[in-house]
């Protein structure tokens, strides 16, 4: 009985500590402009011999990266696409390999022709997980920004 009473305060402390930590939760979003761009890009890449491996709409906060982890196979050709909300001023995507070495960095600004879309090709030098970190900066809207990520693989 004494052991149970001694263990109770420790369990309570662990519960409060775990509940107090901030956690990034993936939440989907809907934006009609982004949906049209997604449909157009899917058709374009599928026509070019790509298959869609993963896609997700994500609710983002201005100036905060949203990590996306994907397994990539050695020698395969991939196309990564990030679409940000058109009212944002800056868009970035950084990609890191398993050793946390940055292997891709792209940035677009609002005034660019295709400013809210970042797309890049990548051939994985070895089979391992990679992390993409899309980010967008919006001066007026700080929370609930809509973003969309897609990963395609070239099949022919």
Which residue stretches match the model-derived regions?
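Non-catalytic, beta-strand-enriched accessory regions in extracellular/secretory proteins
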Residues: 49-73, 77-79
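Bacterial Sec-dependent N-terminal signal peptides
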Residues: 1-25
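C-terminal edge strands of extracellular/lumenal beta-sandwich accessory domains
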Residues: 21-45, 95, 126-156
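Beta-sandwich interaction modules
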Residues: 70, 114-126
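Non-cytosolic beta-sheet module surface loops
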Residues: 70-72, 82-86, 124
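Extended, low-complexity, turn-rich repeat/linker tracts enriched in Gly/Pro/Ser/Thr and Asp/Glu
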Residues: 84-92, 139-142
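Solvent-exposed serine/threonine-rich low-complexity stretches and specific carbohydrate-binding patches
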Residues: 104-112
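Short, surface-exposed beta-strand/strand-loop-strand elements in extracellular ectodomains
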Residues: 87-103
